[in-house]
Amino acid sequence: MGKRFFFILILAFPLISWGQTKTNWETLAGVQYSYIQNYEQNFWYGKPTFSDKVKALENQEIIIQGFIIPGDISGNSYYLSAFPFSSCFFCGGAGQESIMELRLKNPKKKLKLDQVVTLKGTLRLNDHELELNYILEEAVVQKD
């Protein structure tokens, strides 16, 4: 009985992580930009063209690690960055592909500036100017 259970457990182990793709920022860097002017609001923005590798991640559950950047004072909005605050897209000149908007499954969870976290969620690609290129929906902080 014990050997059979152990054998079944070994066979089932790969299924536990099935459906999730561990992703890194290097993969998400697979994007090119065409700069377009928004005449109504008078600003330029980078319209992304995603690589096939990035497109394959759309609407997939991914796992990614990065640095937390709070989006507002109330602590209800967060971003995940490939770099700490001093080097992030908004502050230090990194590219648009190095940050993603987080839509937390539990928005009451408080996260700190530059906290290193691993998150799991569904990746949505966005090519509209008013949101970031990458949005992680139903994001959950993983236990390290």
Give the residues covered by each predicted segment.
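OB-fold and OB-like single-stranded nucleic-acid-recognition modules
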Residues: G19-D144
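Sec-dependent N-terminal signal peptides
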Residues: R4-P14
